């Protein structure tokens, strides 16, 4: 596991890497492409998936941003004794449609074996949470937090967590448009607000009105909000960030 440069988690852990959403603003793809070793897998799984039982020396991304299970990393949470807030799979979407359920189960089992940590997951496919919950495969322990990326109203329509008894949060980073949180089927217990980073030509700068409407709704519904520094760059007068747990 690695120390995080973001303020809402203390460490990142990437037993699975790679993603197929193809988001134009993705920092993870840029990183994996930069350090892509360009190796050829002698025994890839169907669908272009990869399993690494052992570390390949000197390269964290031997197959670039193609989905890969780094099985040798599964014991890392157990080997980290001091409690941490862990962002799980910061370099992947663990709950993407292309990820085998068996991979997800291996990761969740590894988390359960190290209950001293708080685990934060994040996906653009929250329906997978429901599917796993219906199969009794989704942990409900208090140290598991399930996040959904909600960048605009299109993502709100995909959020269907109402009635599921789990800790949930939204990551509105990057915020790409106005979001009417009242339209969601179920509300999160925490919100992270942030702006797009990088220098792509179509980079979206969030409007103050978008931010203020979200903050007002969260205040009314007692939902704590964490403000990323990349958003404070535009709006330095934002209130102090808050967490749903004691810090």
Model-inferred region functions:
Residues 1-144, 153-161, 179-183, 204:
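Conserved Radical SAM active-site core
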């Amino acid at each position: 596991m690695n120390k995080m440069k973001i303020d809402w988690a203390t460490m990142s852990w990437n037993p699975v890497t790679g993603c197929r959403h193809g988001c134009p603003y993705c920092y993870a793809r840029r990183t994996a492409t930069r350090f892509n070793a360009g190796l050829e897998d002698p025994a890839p799984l169907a669908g272009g998936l990869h399993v690494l039982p052992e570390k390949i020396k000197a390269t964290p991304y031997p197959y670039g941003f193609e989905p890969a299970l780094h099985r040798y990393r599964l014991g890392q949470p157990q080997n980290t004794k001091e409690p941490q807030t862990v962002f799980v799979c910061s370099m992947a979407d663990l709950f993407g449609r292309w990820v085998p359920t068996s991979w997800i189960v291996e990761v969740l089992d590894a988390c359960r074996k190290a209950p001293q940590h708080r685990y934060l997951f994040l996906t653009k496919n929250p329906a997978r949470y429901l599917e796993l919950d219906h199969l009794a495969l989704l942990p409900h322990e208090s140290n598991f937090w399930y996040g959904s990326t909600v960048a605009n109203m299109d993502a709100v329509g995909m959020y269907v967590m109402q009635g599921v008894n789990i800790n949930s949060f939204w990551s509105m980073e990057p915020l790409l448009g106005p979001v009417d949180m009242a339209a969601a089927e179920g509300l999160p217990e925490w919100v992270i607000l942030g702006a797009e980073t990088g220098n792509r030509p179509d980079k979206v700068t969030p409007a103050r009105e978008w931010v203020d409407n979200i903050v007002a709704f969260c205040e009314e519904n007692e939902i704590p909000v964490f403000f990323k520094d990349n958003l404070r760059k535009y709006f330095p007068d934002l209130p102090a960030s808050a967490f749903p747990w004691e810090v």
